Amino acid sequence: MCIRDRPAPVPEFQNEKDIFQVIREGDVFLHHPYMSFDPVVNFVRQAAKDPDVLAIKQTLYRVSGNSPIIAALAQAAENGKQVSVLVELKARFDEENNIVWAKKLEKAGCHVIYGLVGLKTHSKITLVVRREETGIRRYVHLATGNYNDSTAKLYTDCGIFTCDERFGEDATAVFNMLSGYSEPKSWNKLIVAPIWMKDRFLSLIEREAENAKKGLPALIRAKMNSLCDPKIIAGSVSYTHLRAHETELHL
């Protein structure tokens, strides 16, 4: 599919199936702009209206001018749900817009977190806590791209829906950390910057380098917006000298 074409519908979410039921049936991977961003918007919209949803937590870095995400979060708070939103005020070129959105969310009753001192929160996470027959279940959306329905039609990004409890526990820990409640000592599945991510990447690069030295299968495949950390670059270059034909870096 070419970018000039309309984004393809996500097969799992066709036929107007309940979005939570779909996620319970299995994780769903999204690749934008080739796949529609609608399921992401609908995820928040349905959570806002669902009487069994207890809480919604989300990080916002950059949103569209008439954001359906903001509208859904405000509606959720007005419907009596616990809504916590981190609005990053240091998002370059969007500082003023984000202040406006933050005030709108606060007015609707959302608990707004204005980022962490000395850090820029760039992660894109949504956590929905839902009451079900089997107990409380956590639904998570993780993404590389902003919760921006306009740029999602232009930028290449990935996202995933899951209700895997390991991700739910990690997402809860992230929001507790952003809220200042606690700092987790370990993670189930997520790798979180700035404390844990760099060392983890370096250890993974070193592992592949050691495998290459031993003649074992070795591969590094990475996709990123930019690469500027000297140690990561040095490790990657060192590895490519060993097995250049098995390294893929997409910038």
Question: What is the role of each PLM region?
Answer:
Residues 4-220, 229, 237-238:
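N-terminal localization/anchoring segments of enzymes in phospholipid and broader phosphate metabolism
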Residues 224:
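Short, small/polar-rich loop/turn modules that mediate ligand/substrate recognition or access, typified
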